């Protein structure tokens, strides 16, 4: 099974509730979840949150693959690492060793379903044990 996990908090200090603020007419979180929902490579999508507002917004998406993972308050603090909530999720769920885990950021609204499908195809083809996506950035766009 291919499982996507999005850790999402309400408690951002810089932009409170940023993950559910409107971005192009939908909550920011919507765009990543929609891409996962439409991906042929994803079986289940888990939103890891302790925030009732986020839970309500996600339920309103009405996506068939989406489930809520109730992360602990301890792993929803400003000082909590992404790794700690991933470990909490993996330890509480009943996965098997053949399951594939996708960590997805809610703050990546430009990701598309084909991006997940291509990444998964490459992961399988090359028999990798992990895959990380990134973008090359340039300080000045006019430089090569």
Give, region by region, the residue ranges found by the protein language model.
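Residues at the starts of beta-strands that form the adenosine-phosphate
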Residues: 1, 43-45, 99, 129
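N-terminal nucleotide-binding beta1-loop-alpha1 segment
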Residues: 1-16
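Short, well-formed alpha-helical segments that are part of the catalytic scaffolds
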Residues: 15-38
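Conserved N-terminal catalytic core of the sugar/cofactor nucleotidyltransferase
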Residues: 31-97
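Short acidic donor-binding/metal-coordinating loop in glycosyltransferase active sites
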Residues: 73, 106-108
């Amino acid at each position: 099974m291919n499982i996507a996990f999005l850790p999402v908090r309400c408690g951002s200090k810089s932009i409170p509730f940023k993950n559910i603020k409107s971005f192009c007419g939908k909550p920011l979180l919507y765009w990543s979840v929609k891409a996962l929902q439409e991906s042929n490579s994803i079986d289940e999508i888990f939103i890891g949150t302790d925030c009732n507002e986020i839970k309500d917004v996600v339920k309103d998406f009405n996506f068939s693959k989406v489930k809520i993972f109730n992360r602990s308050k301890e792993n929803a603090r400003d000082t909590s690492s992404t790794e700690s909530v991933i470990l909490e999720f993996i330890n509480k769920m009943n996965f098997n060793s053949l399951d594939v885990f996708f960590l997805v950021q809610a703050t990546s609204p430009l990701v598309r379903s084909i991006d997940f499908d291509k990444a998964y195809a490459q992961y399988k083809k090359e028999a990798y044990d992990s895959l990380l996506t990134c973008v090359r950035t340039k300080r000045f766009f006019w430089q090569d």
